[in-house]
A protein has these predicted regions:
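Glycine- and acidic-residue-biased ligand/ion/polar-headgroup-sensing regions
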Residues: 34, 45-57, 74-75
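Short phosphate-coordinating micro-motif centered on Lys-Gly-acidic
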Residues: 37-42
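Short beta-strand segments in beta-sandwich/barrel cores
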Residues: 27, 36, 54-59, 100-101
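Residues that scaffold the ATP/ADP-binding catalytic core of kinase and kinase-like folds
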Residues: 58, 80-81, 112, 153, ...
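Short, Lys/Arg-enriched N-terminal segment that forms or immediately precedes the first helix
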Residues: 129-140
Length: 188
């Protein structure tokens, strides 16, 4: 998908001049399976949006265990590891499959946000959606049983269980891989 189509259909920018300006700063990037978009602690140099493929956000806990924070699967999903675009990343973002992202150099993205309120509205909308998704996840993790969490995952991320390592799914759902395996067997 080319940048102009993305900013017309996926993340709509109504004003044609502004859309052309943002599209001209954007480039489609290919990530190999296993490649990192950003690592925890690094400052992002690009503002990226998922076009195709699967991304995983994760961090290491105090024991060095890999904890899956989020999955990116939908076209248009921002691949943003922190709310402040100029802050060090709080998570690493890794491609779990061959992946395409649309990227804008961070300096240009920040400049555009500083000078055009229309883009601030779009950014605020993306932040709201992200907050809603993270609060939904937090509610699911802390108010539902392991089986209910797994069923929520299957509904929210259809088909993803067959595309990613089950260890990542178990971590995301705050359960052991053994528990996830038992739940999968129970639903067969």
């Amino acid at each position: 998908m080319d940048p102009n189509t993305f900013f017309t259909k996926i993340l709509p920018i109504q004003d044609e001049v502004l859309r052309a300006q943002v599209a001209s700063l954007s480039q489609v990037r290919e990530l190999d399976k296993g490649a990192f978009l950003v690592r925890e602690g690094e400052t992002m140099t690009q503002l990226s949006f998922l076009l195709s493929g699967i991304l995983r956000g994760f961090f290491l806990d105090y024991n060095g265990r890999d904890i899956t924070d989020c999955f990116g699967v939908r076209c248009g999903t921002p691949a943003v590891p922190t709310f402040r675009l100029d802050a060090p990343s709080t998570i690493s973002i890794q491609a779990l499959t061959e992946t395409q992202v649309l990227s804008i150099p961070m300096a240009e993205a920040l400049d555009l946000l500083e000078h055009d309120v229309r883009l601030v509205y779009i950014y605020n909308h993306l932040l709201q959606v992200s907050m809603e998704e993270h609060w939904q996840l937090k509610t699911v993790l802390h108010k539902r049983s392991a089986m209910e969490r797994y069923q929520w995952f299957l509904e929210t991320y259809p088909g993803l269980i067959d595309q990613v390592t089950h260890r990542y799914v178990a971590s995301f759902l705050e359960m052991s891989p053994v528990t996830l395996s038992r739940l999968r067997s129970a639903l067969r």
